[in-house]
């Protein structure tokens, strides 16, 4: 299989692109595998967080150009390129990046909610060097998240930046030593899993959609999305656990 999926005891779904001989380039099988894993993540209540990584010390080098020239298209339904860029997971998803996250590989990472990277990782959209366009989200997601001029430099030169620079400008959440990205992502996932499922879902939705709203719309939409959380059993449990100085026992309702 080109995509390996496993579940930890803590309710974390780990998705590994396993084509190290091709630097984890995305072909049709990878796209379908990631899409299926994300469907599972969202469908199973016991799964709380996802981690997406690559085998063999490389995250992903983008689209498999050899497969592309033969007519293969690495899209998966409405999820888009690699089964993720147009519709990612509803639950939190962390990219654990080692080595290269280039072209579509960078766009996959940008489709995730959080990025943990080894200090020697490299990020870039070199499509212009190949007569192509970074059309899997990179060209509009980057200027939403980093300064305009840096986004334009990455888009027009095709040159990559290192993980430390990526962290400095806000692309990477946590830097770890080379080879420790997955461990770092697991640590971050464990922090997230400790929190209430309904509150996590509402918080992610509001943060994701905030840039679409005016301030007036934001208040209304936040109230609609988050209002039910305050009357939930989990909200009551959170208050009780705090008062009783114990860990909460979330029910997701």
Which residues fall in each region the model found?
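Conserved CoA-thioester-binding segment of acyl-CoA-metabolizing enzymes
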Residues: 1-55, 183
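Terminal peptide-recognition signature
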Residues: 15, 19, 33-34, 52, ...
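Crotonase-fold acyl-CoA enzyme core
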Residues: 87-200, 231-232, 236-240, 246, ...
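Short, active-site-adjacent cap segments at secondary-structure transitions
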Residues: 57-61, 102-103, 124, 207
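Short gly/ser/thr-rich secondary-structure transition/capping motifs
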Residues: 32-35, 74-79, 208-209
